[in-house]
């Protein structure tokens, strides 16, 4: 994924292996306990680390997290299909930078002016420079990263190890994240009850960049709660909210369907169609990358 050596087998990329790497680093540094913060796939790795050695975790912060597997699929709509097509076609740092900006930040944030330039222009130049200096991500690295997210899950035993040890947890998420969907982050928080607090902020996938002050406040509050040994019941803000939210959502859906049954069915079918198109685009992109590995054989000119 970075500049280090890259395993050729995607099976060598798992959140468990990466959590073991993090634990080895803690041992090397002599850290008995730590406040652990993870973002996106790093949040998955942090959960695995917390499940491995819960007694060594002081607090756990999960930014823009999902539960892995099918929850890694983004919301498929016209915007996401456009992004997928642009991602597959991106061959230069400039093209990749433009795609990354739309997946990392909200449009509102990118359109804000900082001096005479928009954030989009400023960040675009920074992204192009960074990608140009480090190079485009290798296919093996990308496929390994996808494999790590796709195969990630937490067993009931692992979930119990995390939530029963006594350290507080914050699940921090951007409401406009199109990569890691907010509904899946809420599920993560609900599974980690009674230890988790849900923090929803105005931002996208890189909510820590869009809302640094709010994220820092949330992290500081988490650390203070850990040091003060606050009870988990006092820490969590999800007492019954998860179930109530699901029931409310179901009621709204049924009400809408009752008001216009065929309209509801058409809307569901449209979403399914867009979802299938998105999956097909991802498969097509994967096949294109595989075919590019095979170089055509050169045939010499026939002698007359």
What are these regions (language model features)?
Residues 1-37:
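Active-site loop/oxyanion-hole signature of alpha/beta-hydrolase fold enzymes
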Residues 36-38, 63, 172:
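Short beta-strand immediately N-terminal to the catalytic nucleophile in serine-hydrolase-like folds
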Residues 38-42, 46:
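Gly/Ala-rich beta-loop-alpha elbow adjacent to hydrolase catalytic centers
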Residues 51-52, 58-92:
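Flexible "cap/lid" loop of the alpha/beta hydrolase fold
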Residues 94-146, 150-153, 158-161:
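Conserved alpha/beta-hydrolase catalytic His-Asp/Glu region
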Residues 165, 171-173, 177:
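Short beta-strand/loop motif that positions the catalytic acidic residue
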Residues 178-184:
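Conserved alpha/beta-hydrolase "acid-adjacent" motif
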Residues 194-304:
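Catalytic active-site module of serine/aspartate enzymes centered on a nucleophile-bearing elbow/loop
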């Amino acid at each position: 994924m970075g500049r280090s050596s890259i395993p050729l087998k995607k099976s060598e990329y798992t959140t468990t292996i990466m959590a073991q790497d993090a634990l080895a680093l803690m041992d090397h540094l002599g850290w008995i306990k730590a406040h652990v913060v993870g973002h996106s796939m790093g949040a998955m790795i942090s959960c695995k680390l917390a499940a491995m050695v819960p007694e060594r975790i002081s607090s756990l912060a999960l930014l823009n997290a999902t539960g892995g597997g099918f929850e890694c699929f983004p919301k498929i709509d016209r915007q996401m299909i456009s992004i997928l097509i642009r991602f597959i076609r991106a061959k230069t740092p400039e093209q990749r930078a433009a795609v990354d900006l739309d997946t990392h930040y909200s449009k509102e944030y990118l359109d804000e002016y900082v001096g005479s330039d928009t954030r989009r222009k400023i960040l675009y130049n920074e992204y192009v420079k960074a990608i140009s200096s480090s190079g485009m991500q290798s296919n093996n690295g990308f496929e390994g990263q996808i494999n790590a997210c796709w195969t990630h899950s937490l067993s009931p035993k692992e979930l119990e190890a995390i939530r029963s040890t006594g350290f507080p947890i914050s699940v921090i998420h951007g409401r406009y994240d199109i990569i890691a969907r907010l509904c899946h982050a809420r599920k993560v928080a609900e599974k980690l009850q009674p230890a988790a607090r849900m923090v929803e902020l105005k931002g996208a996938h890189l909510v820590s960049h869009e809302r640094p002050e709010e994220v820092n406040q949330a992290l500081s509050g988490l650390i203070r709660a850990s040091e003060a040994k606050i009870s988990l019941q006092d820490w969590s803000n999800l007492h019954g909210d998860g179930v109530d939210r699901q029931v409310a959502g179901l009621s709204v859906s049924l009400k809408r369907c009752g008001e216009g049954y065929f309209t509801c069915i058409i809307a569901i079918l449209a979403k399914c169609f867009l979802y299938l198109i998105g999956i097909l685009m991802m498969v097509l992109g994967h096949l294109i990358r595989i075919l590019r590995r095979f170089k055509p054989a050169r045939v010499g000119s026939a002698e007359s």
